[in-house]
């Protein structure tokens, strides 16, 4: 009888330790995933901020994104930025 109780208590202790380990691992993975998401968001915000001038007024000497070019559109009397049919390399 004592052996059975000891075995049950020992098994519960092992399960508690394993559960704690899995929980710690899951928390570490969750933190890593959150950091990765924040990095991706920061990168996309930078890219969007750099290229916010689509269809905006421009001149040939103004800086622009690699895939946007300054074109004169008639009958509009100013130049606008349009896509140059290329894709940015990542």
Curated annotation (Swiss-Prot):
Disulfide bonds: 51-65, 58-70
Superkingdom to which the source organism belongs: Eukaryota
InterPro entries: Huwentoxin-1
Propeptide part(s) removed at maturation, as residue ranges: 20-50
Entry GO MF terms: ion channel inhibitor activity; toxin activity
Localization, UniProt: Secreted
Stretch forming the signal peptide: 1-19
Chief location bin: secreted
Tissue specificity statement from the Swiss-Prot or TrEMBL entry: Expressed by the venom gland.
GO CC annotations on file: extracellular region
Keywords associated with the record: Disulfide bond, Ion channel impairing toxin, Knottin, Secreted, Signal, Toxin
Protein's job: Ion channel inhibitor.
Domain observations: The presence of a 'disulfide through disulfide knot' structurally defines this protein as a knottin.
Homology family: Belongs to the neurotoxin 10 (Hwtx-1) family. 13 (Hntx-13) subfamily.
The protein, known as: U7-theraphotoxin-Hhn1k
Origin species: Cyriopagopus hainanus
